[in-house]
Amino acid sequence: MEKTYNPQDIEQPLYEHWEKQGYFKPNGDESQESFCIMIPPPNVTGSLHMGHAFQQTIMDTMIRYQRMQGKNTLWQVGTDHAGIATQMVVERKIAAEEGKTRHDYGREAFIDKIWEWKAESGGTITRQMRRLGNSVDWERERFTMDEGLSNAVKEVFVRLYKEDLIYRGKRLVNWDPKLRTAISDLEVENRESKGSMWHIRYPLADGAKTADGKDYLVVATTRPETLLGDTGVAVNPEDPRYKDLIGKYVILPLVNRRIPIVGDEHADMEKGTGCVKITPAHDFNDYEVGKRHALPMINILTFDGDIRESAQVFDTKGNESDIYSSEIPAEFQKLERFAARKAVVAAVDALGLLEEIKPHDLTVPYGDRGGVVIEPMLTDQWYVRADVLAKPAVEAVENGDIQFVPKQYENMYFSWMRDIQDWCISRQLWWGHRIPAWYDEAGNVYVGRNEDEVRKENNLGADVALRQDEDVLDTWFSSALWTFSTLGWPENTDALRQFHPTSVMVSGFDIIFFWIARMIMMTMHFIKDENGKPQVPFHTVYMTGLIRDDEGQKMSKSKGNVIDPLDMVDGISLPELLEKRTGNMMQPQLADKIRKRTEKQFPNGIEPHGTDALRFTLAALASTGRDINWDMKRLEGYRNFCNKLWNASRFVLMNTEGQDCGFNGGEMTLSLADRWILAEFNQTIKAYREALDSFRFDIAAGILYEFTWNQFCDWYLELTKPVMNGGTEAELRGTRHTLVTVLEGLLRLAHPIIPFITETIWQRVKVLCGITADTIMLQPFPQYDASQVDEAALADTEWLKQAIVAVRNIRAEMNIAPGKPLELLLRGCSADAERRVNENRGFLQTLARLESITVLPADDKGPVSVTKIVDGAELLIPMAGLINKEDELARLAKEVAKIEGEISRIENKLANEGFVARAPEAVIAKEREKLEGYAEAKAKLIEQQAVIAAL
């Protein structure tokens, strides 16, 4: 084997070999249980980020683990067309490169442009997924706009429409005036903002007066510009100030519209003035109030968010109406909405109707992609009746057909599902699945799979002109069908029968509503088993936390703290990293701050660590928490782990290749160390499998690390040296056999998490075991064997390790050279301790570098010594002639002074209020941790001073 482990040389050729050999495909053995994971489809034109790498590492670990258990495994791969995101990228691109908008191109040509862009950049993410070692079946790769998936989308839409579960209605939606489309509640980002509350007088009509004799009501509003669309004023029916006015009218300022005063709980007596203006077409709460009191709806805004030239007037049901005039005063027409706000306030003030303006804290909705203030807008949209679909989806989780891991996410799911609103599925975009609905000139709507079907079903001749609905479906509509559309539905395919319901869905908790809930609803409605019972899309939902940076901040381009997973695999120079983080920024003014931060964090760029080290780190971080802080130190630690495994394997091979390892018969004697490592390894298998079976990848990674590094490399390889240097033929055969057996099993155990290094080493080790199979990927996963757990060997070895560590600690504390042989005395020995010493003198003398071992008689106290206690004995190392007492005390005093300096430096830092207020929580925690470490070190040194002073 090469002297050093070089991931760059092995990873890509190995992956290409695996893919070419077809190892990622299902084994097709239908007598075996199937295991299937559907990858959450990433955006087709995107690139891999840490969240993808994290979730895909977990999925690949599960798939490889189940594949090695002989299951018929499918990891279904694919990408998402990501409507709004992809359209925005291409719109930006043509604006930057050609100075054009999509309207300059027209719909067909612009969509062609997007397909071109997909062809150009659509391969990036799949290339990157290969680099991660993902063992997905590439031959089954799907895209949400593939013909097959598009047919499934049409099929679902048509069936839901025929069942009256999809309808078209004029409703209030979140409108993004920049992107000119409806967006869902989940895509709205609410930001805290400092604003104003305007108090405006609305004159009472017909000589009415308030309880205290005023001829006007004072209405408090944060949105004076929408006054032009008011159709009522609400007061609380219990409010003594106004309840006698319910049913009377006010005259709306500026427009002179006569509008009613209604009694409604929405008006809060304690808030503002207790009178609320009602604009059903421009506010979600007002829309509901308007419905309850049959108020008309007046839309005063264009889709760009400007004031219209004439208003649209509708009755409560959304039909056009002439109950009110559609006139808008000329001075406000065509004004942008925030300019209109100023103009309305000025006009009201000029009439003497502006009573006061108060500062007011409010929450303002922004579109998370367009970045502008969202406008509630009255539009015709398509909706899914969600309550009908939600009922079975709630029951599936209640009765355990679907389980959430961690379980607490079930409550999050229930709270949303039990109060679910109808789902607005239409989007005013061009890129996506076009809604399969057609209109004739009279405005009648026809829904069908295509225009021919519509004409046939409705007997429409060629003379009837039809135009297709311009809108496309919400991206999440097609994603909701992902588990079954990818397997060939609506055809009843073999794949659907074999792999549905799927086994596990891995997802971030941030898309539990967007995606998880909707998959459950859609799947249970459309997929039934042979008895007609609704099928769930998956049995388990494993929710991951979100990967944040080392300070707990969300990774984002604007913060400049994004780490590309492949930069940790391949390494990246500082100039390249700076270019990546500060080039093409949406907010160039942040570049300087980002540059400084990056230079501080990565002064030499990022070193290459290889894919396995990245995967191991991600698995080790997969705790059950919501937030997972990335840690470069751990990545370095797991790269060191890979090096350690490589070097240990070289040691094993150097001692076994070309030797008799006992795989072809011959007498074998197992040493205590051999019996111990086999017992440890089997206990490791058991605990590791339990961790993987319960989705505790962090615990599994910890178990693997602890066994490999501490037990196998640090102890067992050392413990084999006495046999290797002077054992009998049978002992040598036994130890070689154990070395190879444990290493080969360990490689299979570790393979799901670190596939590349394990396959590479295994190819060398398999020859020694007489294995002829081609790949570790299809080898059986290690099984726990209770007969290999030798309790006596475990107990005896544990004791020997304690004794060896005790002697090593005395050396370190007393500053004695590691190579100097020592004399060891044992005092107050139990029978067990004496037996252990006598049976294992060779081990003890070699590993603790001892020149002699003497068990003292019961009454002998022994000479002046440094002592350590182990189970059933006291270990003594006589100090005569080993150290110079004065020099040693002086050295320790110097050490103590140095540590005290560090302690006071950190204490001053933590006492500085400015530092504590400014520094991130993670930084403060790190300082406290350092302080604890120094305090412990100081206590140890003082203890040593006392021991030496007493000599």
From Swiss-Prot:
Enzyme Commission no: 6.1.1.9
Protein family (similarity comment): Belongs to the class-I aminoacyl-tRNA synthetase family. ValS type 1 subfamily.
GO biological process, one term: valyl-tRNA aminoacylation
Cited Pfam families: Anticodon_1 (PF08264), tRNA-synt_1 (PF00133), Val_tRNA-synt_C (PF10458)
Motif ('KMSKS' region): 554-558
Keywords: Aminoacyl-tRNA synthetase, ATP-binding, Coiled coil, Cytoplasm, Ligase, Nucleotide-binding, Protein biosynthesis
HAMAP family (alphabetical): Val_tRNA_synth_type1
The protein's name: Valine--tRNA ligase
Subunit structure: Monomer.
Binding, ATP: K557
